[in-house]
Regions:
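Family-positioned intrinsically disordered, low-complexity linker/tail segments enriched in G/S/T/P
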Residues: 1-3, 9-113
Length: 113
């Protein structure tokens, strides 16, 4: 008896990445029950590369100053999340925040992921 098994494997593009943060003022006070802007920059190859994908989220903090969102499901201003080719090497995530208008972002850091 000959048994032939064929597997079909489809690579799936991630729909996004969960992100959670606690928002504080520069003096360390919690930013509670207030809408804040987050800007996420995805850079390929180095921390100083030009972002290939940028998105913005406008989300409320809760009673503890926390936000929860999905990177990849915000308002894209550069690029298309689903078109990122994750096999092309290292990627970095830059995070910026603005607790006021969406025009005065403060860089919170960039990390490889």
């Amino acid at each position: 008896m000959l048994l032939v098994v064929i597997f079909s494997v489809n690579a799936q593009v991630p729909q996004g990445f969960n992100y959670q943060a606690t928002v504080r003022t520069s003096s360390g006070d919690l930013v509670m029950n207030q809408n804040v802007y987050f800007k996420f920059n995805i850079l390929q190859g180095s921390q100083t590369a030009v972002p290939g994908y940028v998105e913005i989220h406008y989300v409320p903090t809760d009673d503890l100053g926390q936000v929860t969102l999905v990177i990849g499901q915000g308002s894209a201003s550069t690029g298309v999340f689903a078109e990122i080719d994750w096999s092309l090497g290292s990627y970095y995530l830059g995070i910026e925040i603005d607790t006021n208008t969406g025009n005065g972002y403060i860089a919170m850091g960039t990390t490889q992921f």
